[in-house]
Amino acid sequence: GRYLATGRFRDGGWSGMGPALFAYRPWVDASGTPAAPGTHLEAVPLLLYESSQASEDIVRSLVGYQHPDEWEGGVWVTTAAGKTAVLFAGTKGIGDKYWYGYVNPAGPEYPCVDQDFVGQFTVCRLADGSPCPASDLTECSGHNDYRGWWSSAFAAQFILYDPADLADVAAGTLDAWEPQPYAVLNVDDYLLDNPAGIEIDLLGSGAQRHYRLGAVAYDDANGLLYVLELFADEAKPVVHVWQIQS
């Protein structure tokens, strides 16, 4: 058995168009012999969507995927009644359009692409993944210097997967890009939302505020889910706690 799991997420789809999860073990045999320093541990992908480096199209992705998505932490949740789920927390792009470039001073509904990259890749897309009209492929005036992937709106979300789907991936009966969340929870109403106004140019504001959630942890014995809200106490995070019911 592989008792540990790890993963990563990078905006732009470099690590896959959705969260990634790999199962592994830190020992090399049935006796529990630790791996030697520098050993490459074998890992089994449980969740791995298509990479943007392999496909320019939004395919084999998380449903509703956008390039500005941010998935920062994940946990295996088990309730007192024995129900289980794999939960990821992050800041999800949910806007009608998303683009590579800058925040547009005219408003979140207006893209502001980096003109230098127009023609190199699809710098602006609609929510369904199709390209934006040509009228959106212009760099606005008066923007700041914080270039990256932006959506016209973000939401702080938990997404929950059925562990049975991930087990099917490990068994080879599902492809690693096939599992999808069975539930999505928007938790923005519980957040402080950068009350000190730290790094507005970097973080965005209002509907375009990203970097909302950070790492997560789960207290299995007491059913407590701990989630970091980033930039909630000036530059420091605040820990939110949810009681998971059975």
Which residues does each PLM region occupy?
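Sequence/structural signature of beta-propeller domains
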Residues: 1-246
